[in-house]
UniProtKB/Swiss-Prot annotation:
This is ATP-dependent DNA helicase CHL1. A motif (DEAH box) lies at residues 359-362. It comes from the Eukaryota. The keyword Iron applies. One of its GO terms (biological process) is establishment of sister chromatid cohesion. It comes from Meyerozyma guilliermondii (strain ATCC 6260 / CBS 566 / DSM 6381 / JCM 1539 / NBRC 10279 / NRRL Y-324). It is found in: Nucleus. Residues 67-100, 121-166 are annotated as: Disordered.
Length: 825
């Protein structure tokens, strides 16, 4: 097979490696043959993102060519009534074919005209084409904040026709009207011409990962579905108001919730309406939105560039970007937007028959649970109650009766929950993992006074949380009081809402956070929340660098999908076998390395571990990364070695760096470590699950060795894990399983969390084809075939099956780097 043919390499911008072609083959096959779910593991550094882009976009362009706009003919009539008989049914076939051919020709011609239009725009800086609305010609004056800014609209009753709810509904109608007007506002870009028959949704965890995706997409191009003329990739990144808002005052707010509420409030007030918001029945505004849409398609843009485009054109990028949703071939969006049905609905985002690609999917189970889970501690409740009382006392005379009554009910409700926690503490009921009995919480309370549904509706419709939070923040600024790291009132609001609508797949339970008591609502069964995505989409592709072990996805994410509709593919590493050495260390002399909970602090083992690290430091050039199972254990190690002098001995061989739990110091530590590693050498002690193990890539001299200390099992005594394992056992038994099976499934889940963390941490080390590294796994349990079966495939294939002495391990390390030195010569 000639892999130089771009059609056989999926239009990859470079000559792909064999493993990249294999991955692209697997993805294309999954989409083409309508598998419902695809699981793809491609080790970090193997060009996974480009492989995903090239295979999926090649399929889409091929699909568009075969469709040949054939749906256009059927869309032109009888769309709303499929049972209606058309006059054309009586016409001869040649007449129908001629009619459809005429429509295809016309729509194809318009699409080609639009491509030419985009080509012209791509040559012209958008900043020079700003259209100023008449009302925007004056210079904006900064308005001083006064107490009126902190007052909510009058809130009269739940049925008032002039209520905030009515205003919100009217506002949504206006937004929809704007988008519909724009869809037909320019003859060059009628919506039905450019609507993509299938949309690719790419979702990832972080903003930076989505930006990286946009940059990778920008270096690709694909065969046109329009014939001779080049066809641009129609890409649209979506994000929150917090990322896209260009209003100076609103965008400076501290949280996503505050920005959302402030945005809605500005749209409701005629005298303070956001000047960047698209307007109804305003041709100039329609023109701006259309211009924004065209420029965003002319050149691929990430979120920052989309924000800049909106600022230059003086139109809200959050709302204007909706114009391109139907016409996009690829949409990039964060997990929260994709995985929450209500969010997709509010954006007008349909994933029906689409291709959904979820990157970094190794943490998908946790992500789905976390975005549907909330918690509150007793101390947080106390702080919120104090804030509510402060606000109420300040503004009580200026609030109408509706606001006063509902605020008092909110204060009473928060006080009720706080008192319940205090009483349970006294009675020793707050055992981590044990159920919180919500019925007990409201026992003896006045139902009318504490109608949670009405309070929840008031919080949702009045946006009072934003008003109170901004007032409290300003009060703290004026008094130089330190602000909380996250707006607590929004957190309490989310918790109270969970009391109203708890999912049957979730559970309320107790937990302990330091010396504070927490009530947590946790989604225990993410499969039902994910079902809507799986059943709506054409196919869902879960991709990641470290997907092993995969059993949990089958069991807890899509148990309702038949096995024959799931495709699993694991590709090898881009790095040749001779560039990887995976070694297990069970013992040194007579000391066995066992980092299980009850043995990890054995003094003789810690001493032998320090000596082992010194031996490895003498044989490994440049940088070494050591992963400990937790910050607490790392601190214990360092403290012990400081006292016995072993840390000083290690520091004579490599400059020592420690990961801090304070994320603000990460960049400076990495910078200094990198300089030392490339120089005389350095060793970085890091933590599994910390910043270094998740988001940082260690290539070349930064990680000539990666050392894993023990198996990083999560805290078995955390309330969350106890509740989850209990749920797994109950579910197994409810399906007819035995007690032994229930315990086994619970143990497997616990073990799989640990092994995914191992794979994720080790996977940060080797980044490209010429990279090389030694991986050393310290713990006798790594010699178990059961544990080894859960390692990433590329590690399993490199691990030595036989147990060896530590001296032999050192010899292998020395030989490995000696061979690399000879190769360089």
């Amino acid at each position: 097979m000639n892999r130089d043919d771009p059609r056989l390499t999926y239009n990859h911008p470079y000559k792909p490696y064999d493993i990249q072609v294999q991955l692209m083959d697997a993805i294309y096959d999954t989409i083409q043959n309508k598998y419902k779910v695809g699981l793809f593991e491609s080790p970090t550094g193997t060009g996974k993102t480009l492989s995903i882009i090239c295979s999926s976009m090649t399929w889409l362009r091929n699909y568009k060519k075969t469709q040949d706009h054939s749906t256009m003919g059927s869309n032109s009539s009888n769309d709303n009534d499929p049972n209606q008989t058309s006059d054309s049914d009586e016409e001869p076939d040649w007449v129908k074919e001629a009619h459809i051919k005429n429509i295809r020709s016309r729509t194809s011609g318009l699409a080609i005209d639009y491509e030419r239009h985009l080509e012209e725009l791509s040559q012209t800086p958008h900043a020079g084409h700003t259209v100023e609305l008449g009302q925007r010609t004056h210079k904006r004056k900064k308005r001083a904040t006064n107490d009126d800014d902190f007052l909510p609209d009058d809130y009269n009753s739940d049925t008032d026709s002039n209520s905030v709810e009515t205003k919100n509904a009217k506002l949504q109608q206006e937004i929809n009207q704007i988008m519909k007007r724009v869809d037909g506002s320019d003859g060059k870009t009628p919506g039905f011409v450019n609507t993509c028959p299938v949309t690719i949704f790419f979702s990832s965890r972080t903003h930076s990962q989505l930006s990286q995706f946009a940059h990778q997409l920008s270096i690709t191009s694909f065969e046109s579905s329009l014939g001779e003329i080049a066809e641009r990739i129609k890409f649209m990144p979506l994000s929150s108001r917090k990322q896209l808002c260009i209003h100076p005052k609103v965008s400076s707010l501290s949280s996503v919730s505050a920005v959302n509420d402030a945005c809605v409030e500005l749209q409701q007030k005629s005298d303070k309406r956001c000047e960047f918001m698209p307007r109804v029945n305003n041709p100039e505004s329609d023109q701006l939105v259309q211009r924004f849409a065209d420029y965003s398609f002319a050149v691929i843009k990430d979120i920052e560039e989309l924000h800049e485009l909106g600022a230059d054109l003086k139109v809200c990028p959050y709302y204007a970007s909706r114009r391109n949703i139907e016409n996009s071939e690829i949409i990039a969006l964060p997990y929260q937007m994709l995985l929450q049905q209500a969010t997709r609905k509010s954006l007008g985002l349909s994933i029906k028959d689409s291709i959904v690609i979820i990157d970094e999917a190794h943490n998908l189970l946790d992500v789905i649970s976390s975005i549907n889970s909330v918690s509150i501690t007793r101390k947080e409740l106390s702080s919120v109650i104090a804030s509510l009382k402060l606000y109420y006392n300040k503004f009580t005379k200026r609030l109408n009766s509706g606001n006063r009554i509902h605020l008092m009910k909110l204060i009473k409700l928060c006080s009720l929950v706080e008192t319940y926690i205090k009483n349970c503490e006294i009675q020793n009921k707050c055992v981590p993992g044990s159920d919180v009995l919500i019925d007990e919480l409201f026992q003896g309370s006045t139902g009318d006074l504490l109608n949670i549904h009405r309070i929840e509706k008031y919080l949702d419709k009045s946006k009072i949380a934003y008003k109170i939070q901004t007032y409290i923040e300003q009060s703290r600024e004026e008094s130089d009081e330190k602000q909380a790291s996250s707006p607590l009132l929004f957190k309490v609001t989310a918790f109270l809402k969970s009391l109203v609508n708890p999912s049957k797949e979730g559970r309320f339970f107790w937990d302990k956070i330091n010396d504070d008591t927490e009530i947590k609502y946790l989604l225990l069964d993410p499969s039902e929340m994910f079902r809507d995505v799986v059943e709506s989409a054409r196919c869902v592709l879960l991709c990641g660098g470290t997907m092993e072990p995969v059993e949990d996805y089958y069991r807890y994410l899509f148990p309702y999908v038949p096995g024959e509709k799931i495709k699993k593919f694991t590709c090898g590493h881009i790095v040749p076998q001779e560039n990887i050495e995976v070694l297990t260390v069970s013992s040194r002399k007579t000391t066995v390395f066992d980092f299980s909970y009850h043995k990890r602090n054995d003094p003789s083992m810690l001493r032998e571990l320090a000596l082992s690290l010194q031996d490895i430091c003498e044989r490994v050039p440049n940088g070494i990364i050591v992963f400990a199972p937790s910050y607490k254990y790392l601190n214990q190690l360092i403290s012990t070695w400081r006292k016995d002098g072993n840390l000083a001995k290690i520091s004579t061989l490599k400059q020592v760096f420690l990961e801090s739990s304070d994320s603000t110091s990460i960049e400076s530590i990495l910078r200094d470590y990198g300089a030392a590693a490339r120089g005389s050498g350095a060793i970085l002690f890091s933590v599994v699950g910390g910043k270094m193990s998740e988001g940082v890539n260690f290539s070349d001299e930064l990680a000539r060795a990666v050392i894993m200390l023990g198996l990083p099992y999560p805290n078995a005594f955390s309330g969350e894990l106890i509740a989850k394992r209990k749920f797994i056992e109950e579910t197994t038994l409810s399906k007819g399983g035995t007690q032994a099976m229930a315990k086994k499934n619970s143990r497997e889940y616990y073990e799989n969390i640990c092994m995914r963390a191992v794979n994720q941490s080790v996977g940060r080390s080797i980044r490209h084809a010429n990279d090389y590294s030694v991986i050393v796994l310290f713990d006798t349990r790594y010699n178990s075939s059961h544990i080894q079966s859960k390692l990433s495939g590329w590690m399993r294939s490199s691990i030595r099956p036989e147990r060896e002495s530590f001296d032999m391990t050192l010899e292998r390390i020395a030989d490995f780097f000696a061979a690399k030195t000879l190769t360089k010569r």
